[in-house]
Amino acid sequence: MEGLRRGLSRWKRYHIKVHLADEALLLPLTVRPRDTLSDLRAQLVGQGVSSWKRAFYYNARRLDDHQTVRDARLQDGSVLLLVSDPSEAQRLTPAIPALWEAEASRSLESRSSRPAWPTW
């Protein structure tokens, strides 16, 4: 059964997005669970984006280039942050869900998931 599961993971694809904080871009990528972050960098270079001296962040933690998509626990719809300055990652991490939410609803404005009034 484990061999079948491993064989099927070869065909599994995740549609993720990479948020380039320096250029204010959100790029879609299609990845496999066994792809490494270095493979993601290669895809970005293929799209004309340099990732030199930049770090990937996911859920406020830095990812290493040798990690696979599975090791980083990325899922379909995940958003990675690619920044050159680590302090910028801490500042921008709370904005990622709002950006994703805005794109999902095709709205031009990002919305907060918090209610506008107090809920007591």
Curated annotation (Swiss-Prot):
Domain Ubiquitin-like residue range list: 14-83
Domain of life: Eukaryota
Tissue-by-tissue expression: Detected in stratum corneum (at protein level).
InterPro entries on file: Ubiquitin-like_dom, Ubiquitin-like_domsf
SUPFAM superfamilies: Ubiquitin-like (SSF54236)
Protein name, as recorded: Ubiquitin domain-containing protein TINCR
The organism's taxonomic lineage, starting at the top: Eukaryota, Metazoa, Chordata, Craniata, Vertebrata
Name of the gene encoding the protein in the UniProt record: TINCR
